[in-house]
Amino acid sequence: MQVKRIIHINVSFTLMLSWDETLFKNPEVFDPDYIPDELLFRDGQIRQLVSCIKPAMLNSSPINAFCLGPPSTGKTSTIRYVLREAERETGLLYSYIRIPRFKEPYKVFSKIFQDVLGQQSPPSGISKTVLMDRVWSNLDEPLLVVLDDINFLGKNYANEILYEILKAPDEYGVKVGIVAAATDVKFPLLLDPFVGASFHYMEIHYPSYGYAEIEGILRKRVEHGFYEGVFDDGAFRRVVELAYRASDVRYGIYLLKAAGMNAESRGSRKVEERDVEVAHAGESLSFIAKILTALNSEERAVLRMIYSQNAISTGDLYEQVCSEIKMSYRKYYNILEKLERLKLIEISFGEKGRGKTRYVQGKYDAEVVDRAMQLI
């Protein structure tokens, strides 16, 4: 009996990780800023971006481009991938600006100043005009300005920034182009006609990933990020399912990493489905909170009303909204479009009296969304 007990303990111990062991082969592949050597299912978009940037690599002006598509469709990844490869080949000069971090024109112009001149921008007492005059006066090679998530800018700010860049070739004789990215496909239509008249660009569209594409992308991350055989097949299928339901590859990547960390914390040599469920319960809250930061107070108010009840017709919901907030139907409709684009709600058709009626409902657990709103 004593021998059997010792054998049982030894067998169990072999299934446990020691303190200096890890399941992760390359943990960096799960980082938000990681760009793989191969981007799956975006060959067409990469080719279009390369065609826009190629003139700059030949000492000519880049072609303007607008990358449009829902969140988590590869816009940022393809842009940064092409920039990385172009910089390796020719030392392309570019200024990459992630708008949520630079929401004001002066901050955007300061970033361009820093990237072009290789030094910190002067104190904020210097006007934007003087700041950009120094940039354009010292620019002696083609420049590409990337405005990622430009839809986070207010319309007036976007017009001011775009106009400053677009007028530079005529006023200073410089070679400069713009690559902008937005989750709102209608954003280009919101620009001032005066800006739009001079902002000619190639539209590059990014459709949502399908189930098989999400599975393929996440499979590559598992192969490169974990040691072979570590991630259980059932656990992986669950991650793919949750990522597909959220329509967000990034969420799947978050879950892969979090599930691996959960398995390590309990000393397991295998990532199991229970690790994914624990990760999902914890990560969904922070993931949703991050999405909610893209909403203003009115948009959050509408979202709260949607999540406070079961499926409701868009007409009935509008009446509820107007009882609390003064809002035109056009603005209300645009808010619903944005919430759907961010994958926070679902809009479907159903029968109600004559014809078809649109119904709206939340995609996530109402309690989780409520808690996420309290975090921001």
Swiss-Prot record:
Biological process according to GO: DNA replication
Keywords of the record: ATP-binding, DNA replication, Nucleotide-binding
Organism: Archaeoglobus fulgidus (strain ATCC 49558 / DSM 4304 / JCM 9628 / NBRC 100126 / VC-16)
UniProt-annotated binding residues for ATP: 73-77, 209, 221
Gene3D superfamilies to which the protein is assigned, alphabetical: 1.10.8.60, P-loop containing nucleotide triphosphate hydrolases (3.40.50.300), Winged helix-like DNA-binding domain superfamily/Winged helix DNA-binding domain (1.10.10.10)
Keyword Plastid: no
Name listed for the protein in its UniProt record: ORC1-type DNA replication protein 2
Gene name per UniProt: cdc6-2
Family matches, as NCBIfam families: orc1/cdc6 family replication initiation protein (TIGR02928), PRK00411.1-2 (NF001624)
Role, per record: Involved in regulation of DNA replication.
UniProt-listed HAMAP family: ORC1_type_DNA_replic_protein
Matching Pfam families: AAA_22, Cdc6_lid
Organism domain of life: Archaea
GO MF annotation, one: ATP binding
Entry similarity comment: Belongs to the CDC6/cdc18 family.
PANTHER family for the chain: CELL DIVISION CONTROL PROTEIN 6 HOMOLOG (PTHR10763:SF26), CELL DIVISION CONTROL PROTEIN 6-RELATED (PTHR10763)
Coiled-coil zones: none
